[in-house]
Each structure stands twice: as C-alpha cells, then as structure tokens.
Amino acid sequence: TLMRSSAASDVYKRQLEELINQQIDGGTDAIVIAGTTGESATLTMEEHRDVIKAAIEFTKHRVPVVAGTGSNCTRTAIQLSQEAEEAGADGLLIVTPYYNKATQAGLISHYSQIADSTKCPIIMYNVPGRTGCNLLPETVAELVRTKSNLVGLKEATGNLAQASKPMALTDGKLDLYSGEDGLVVPLMSIGAVGVISVWSNVAPGKVHAMCESFFKGDIKTARKLQLEALPLVDALFSEVNPIPVKKALNLMGMEVGPLRSPLCEMSEANAKKLAEVMKNYGILA
C-alpha cells in the first residue's frame, strides 16, 4: 500500500495505478490487493475498503483482482469480504486468524462462516510464521469438501511435505499457490498453479516467465529463473516483509512512500546489500 507518510489516514493512490499497470504489463495474471505486502494489518477499515475499490477501478477488468479480507475476527472478515464482493472483487484472499491461535475446529468455523457470507471464490492463506496458527492439510480438505467457494490455498509454511498433502486429499479440487518466492518451482512440481508473490512487485516479467515456462514444459528455463532470483528473494526477506520490497520500489523510483508503524525503515546495512543485489539482478541501474 502506497503511503505519503507513516501517519494514519494518509494512504494515497497517485502511484497505485502505475504500479498496477507495471504488473499487468509484466504479465502478472491477477492483482492481489491489501495482503501482507500491502500492510493490511495497519490500515483502517476505511483505508482497507478504499484501496480495494481503487485497485478494482485501476485494473479495469484486464486481470482478476483478489482482495485481502482476512481478520482475526470472523465478523470483521465477513464484513470486509462482503464489501469487497460488492465493490467488484473477483476473489478473496483470507489469512488464518492471527494472535488468538484458533484450533482446527475454530478454523473450520471461521472459514465456513466467511464462505457462507459471499459468493466470491476464496483462497485460504496459511502462514503460521506470522499468525501462530497452522491450517493443517486435513482441515483444508474438510473445508474444500464442504464449501464450494473455498477453492484455493496460499501455502507459506516453507514445508513441501505439508504443502503436498492438501493436493493429495482434495482430488484436484484445490488450487495451490506458493506463498514462498524461493519455492515456486518446487511447489509447481507437486501441482501448484502459481505464486502470490513479493518478488513480482519488482520483477513481474521474471516471475511470469518462470511460471509460464514451467507450465509449457520448459522446466530447465523455469529452474534457471528460480535459481537466479534466490539472492534477490533472500534480500527481499532480509527484514520482515514488506520493509525490503518497499525500499526496493522506492529505489526503483516508484515512490511508494514510507512504512506505517510498527514497521520501520530498513537498516542502512541491509538496504545497501539490497541495492547491490538489485543491480546484479538487473533491476537497478
């Protein structure tokens, strides 16, 4: 999310359309708005709604828009999801509840209530390193079996064995997305259909080319693109996301603004390393 300052109620849209156009021109197949990289946790409800509406407006139906509408409060997630659907979102990305550490029964209840509240297709998002909550494969399978609009899973455990199990348990009814930029090709090898990416913010063409190559059967090229990107991916996660990627975009002249507290600016040493890696990767002069 682009911000003029770190103060509340200071989200701006001047560069959002440019950023969206850059992604689409680079081959990105869908726009995900108000997710982790979009600093959704520090947006007010009004800002959250506004940035989703703006993304839908600027995308102009060229690609689908997936709105991040997760919350650790089921009622809030339902409200955000219904508002995003009304605004024209094509799908929803809903992270597991964070901090309150729901049980698997609680997760089934949470996602079931949200699924019942909207007709939008929903991608569940499992990132236990951030949430303190792990959406287990058996739980995913139960949700997919009982709710027809729970269609996808963004898997960010970094655990290939866990990522494989929902695919085995859902008989082709689940679209798996990598939530780890360093593991896209490995996850596609077990059936993932793509990635919801931080890396693509700075190199959409490379990410698209990697996925396209894999799906066309050119595994050698896909593997090459994945391995070439590993130093950049490491740099983009050298501090908590989205600190490095906002720094990277600002270095590239995108003027996406500062971070909102409690996130803070990248350390000088890590910023220097990031710039060096970006130059080596060919995305910074």
Predicted regions and their residues:
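Active-site beta->alpha loop and helix N-cap motifs at the rims of alpha/beta catalytic domains
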Residues: 10-132, 142
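Surface-exposed amphipathic alpha-helices with a cationic face
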Residues: 52-60, 82-85, 115, 144-145, ...
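Single conserved hydrophobic/aromatic residue that forms the stacking wall/gate
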Residues: 1-8, 12
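Short secondary-structure boundary segments
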Residues: 35, 96-97, 157, 180-181, ...
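A general structural signal for well-ordered alpha-helical segments in protein cores
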Residues: 16, 48, 52, 77, ...
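Structured C-terminal cap/extension of enzyme domains
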Residues: 182-285
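Conserved, mostly hydrophobic/aromatic
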Residues: 23, 55, 84, 114, ...
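Ligand/cofactor pocket segment of small-molecule handling proteins
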Residues: 89-91, 98-103, 107-188, 193
